[in-house]
């Protein structure tokens, strides 16, 4: 019996451990699910996840963001509130973040190796700086601006 080192499996284990240490359940769960998929009969579904996973994730995230509105916990602002400078600024920032996330998706598609650094940076930001793990796409968008890519 020969042992074979699986670098992708090792990376997934490291990401899962960093997720645990950084209290980042989304990284921990994602890395663990992908590791289980890679090591079992579920590996045949990895191309499906690769092709549709990001879109499915964005749909689920959008449902989560819209749910408080549908539940009546967040009210739709009146027209006069839409004209307030803070509301205008929030619209501009929302558009900027969406644009950055779009650049991030393009960069991650063209240079997926950078995703590892972004994920580790996100985990370190959560663990060391008390941040919240919401921004790999936006981080990739900012990185694309810094690199002058996409």
Swiss-Prot record:
Which topology term describes how it sits in the membrane?
A: Multi-pass membrane protein
Q: Which Pfam families match?
A: DUF441 (PF04284)
Compartment(s) where it occurs, according to its Swiss-Prot or TrEMBL record = Cell membrane
**What are the entry keywords?**
Cell membrane, Membrane, Transmembrane, Transmembrane helix
**Is Cell membrane among this UniProt entry's keywords?**
yes
Q: Single GO cellular component annotation?
A: plasma membrane
Main localisation, per the record? membrane
Q: Which InterPro entries does the record cross-reference, listed alphabetically?
A: UPF0756_TM
- Parts of the chain that traverse the membrane: 1-21, 52-72, 82-102, 123-143
Which PANTHER family does this UniProt record tie to the protein? UPF0756 MEMBRANE PROTEIN YEAL
Family membership: Belongs to the UPF0756 family.
This protein is called UPF0756 membrane protein Asuc_1151
């Amino acid at each position: 019996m020969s042992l074979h080192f699986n670098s992708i499996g090792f990376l997934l284990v490291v990401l899962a451990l960093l997720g645990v240490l950084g209290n980042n359940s989304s990284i921990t769960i994602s890395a663990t699910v992908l590791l289980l998929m890679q090591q079992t009969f579920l590996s045949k579904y990895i191309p499906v996840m690769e092709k549709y996973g990001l879109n499915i994730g964005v749909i689920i995230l959008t449902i989560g963001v819209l749910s408080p509105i549908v539940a009546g916990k967040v009210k739709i602002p009146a027209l006069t509130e839409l004209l307030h400078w803070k509301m205008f600024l929030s619209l501009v920032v929302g558009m900027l973040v969406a644009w950055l996330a779009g650049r991030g998706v393009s960069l991650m598609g063209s240079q997926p190796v950078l995703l590892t650094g972004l994920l580790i940076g996100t985990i370190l930001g959560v663990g060391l700086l008390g941040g919240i793990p919401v921004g790999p796409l936006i981080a990739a968008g900012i990185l694309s601006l810094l690199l002058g890519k996409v």
